[in-house]
Amino acid sequence: MGTPASVVSEPPPWRAPPEVRGRKQAAANIFQDAELLQIQGLFQRSGDQLAEERAQIVWECAGDHRVAEALKRLRRKRPPRQKPLGPSVHHCSRLRTAEPCAPQSRATETASSEQHVNSRRASARIRRNWRKPGPTSYLHQIRH
């Protein structure tokens, strides 16, 4: 029995030899050759209010490996999002204006709207408390 052709044959010409396809060697500090404006842009995109001052400090300390690590973490960070409406403003968005109607239907409508608000408050309370860790999860963290 002979050796299969796939083992004996040369790699296809479109595929480079493994030693050529190796990864580029990483620099000790990727920001060492960066310009001041590039570093400022990095801080500005991350939402930093003091981008110019921080960029100047980083640029002066470009040889320090701790600065490079901090900047890599900063680059991964996304800019801050707009804060959602607060609970008080969100509550106001559900308010409706009263329309003139019969007195009997108004009492029924008031009772049903109070039940709706109470059920929403209860579900919001459950959602808030759902993610709070209990004492068992705390003990689990201590044991391990």
Curated annotation (Swiss-Prot):
Residues 1-20, 75-144 are annotated as: Disordered. One of its GO terms (biological process) is positive regulation of MAPK cascade. InterPro entries: AVPI1, Avpi1/C8orf4_dom. May be involved in MAP kinase activation, epithelial sodium channel (ENaC) down-regulation and cell cycling. Residues 105-116 have a biased composition (Polar residues). PANTHER family: ARGININE VASOPRESSIN-INDUCED PROTEIN 1. Keywords: Cell cycle. The keyword Cell cycle applies. It comes from Bos taurus (Bovine). This is Arginine vasopressin-induced protein 1. Residues 118-131 have a biased composition (Basic residues). It holds the Pfam family TC1. The gene is AVPI1.
